[in-house]
């Protein structure tokens, strides 16, 4: 079994330090105190220019849970398109509906837009009403490459 050491960071300094200390991959966020938000574009660009290991970018427009309005989804799509333009390794995202079920429609739409980037569903699944049921369904989506829980 291959163990991949992924480090979640919210600064360029932490990303460089993680790489120097043996991280295999970075999950780049902002506001880790809010469980991670989409980082600023400039941080994404600088981190990509300084690191040699794969970078996956958190796509989460606000820290008030995982339910998103259309304006939030538009911001998420814009962030995904930006990440695609920079050839990051992947994006990390997740959506819930108003009843705290994993929103497969929104996730599938975002994952399809993100192609060919890797798409990882994040901790939103932990807040869903049916973690196991959600997991079993989400892994059937061919555009989803993994789940972080």
Label each PLM-derived region with a short phrase:
Residues 1-26, 31-38:
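N-terminal pre-domain/capping segments
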Residues 1-11, 59-77, 121-131:
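Active-site mouth loops of central-metabolism enzymes
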Residues 3-7, 26-28, 55-59, 91-93, ...:
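Hydrophobic faces of well-ordered beta-strands that scaffold small-molecule active sites
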Residues 12-16, 32-53, 70-74, 95-115, ...:
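Active-site-adjacent beta->alpha loops and helix N-cap segments on the catalytic face
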Residues 18, 47, 83, 110, ...:
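Conserved, mostly hydrophobic/aromatic
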Residues 19-26, 51-54, 87-90, 113-117, ...:
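Glycine-enriched alpha-helix->loop->beta-strand junction motifs that scaffold or abut catalytic
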Residues 78-95, 99-102:
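Ordered, amphipathic secondary-structure segments that act as subunit-interaction surfaces
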Residues 93-101, 137-149:
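Glycine/Thr-rich beta-alpha phosphate-binding loop at enzyme active sites
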């Amino acid at each position: 079994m291959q163990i991949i050491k992924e480090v979640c960071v919210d600064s360029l300094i932490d990303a460089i330090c993680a790489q120097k200390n043996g991280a295999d991959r970075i999950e780049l966020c902002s506001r880790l105190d809010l469980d991670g938000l989409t980082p600023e574009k400039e941080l994404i660009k600088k981190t990509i220019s300084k690191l040699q290991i794969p970078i996956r970018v958190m796509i989460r427009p606000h820290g008030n849970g995982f339910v998103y309005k259309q304006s939030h989804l538009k911001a998420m799509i814009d962030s995904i398109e930006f990440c695609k333009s920079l050839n990051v390794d992947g994006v990390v995202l997740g959506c819930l509906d108003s009843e705290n079920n994993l929103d497969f429609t929104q996730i599938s739409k975002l994952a399809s837009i993100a192609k060919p980037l890797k798409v990882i569903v994040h901790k939103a699944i932990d807040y869903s009403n049916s973690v196991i049921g959600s997991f079993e369904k989400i892994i059937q989506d061919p555009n989803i490459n993994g789940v972080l829980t």
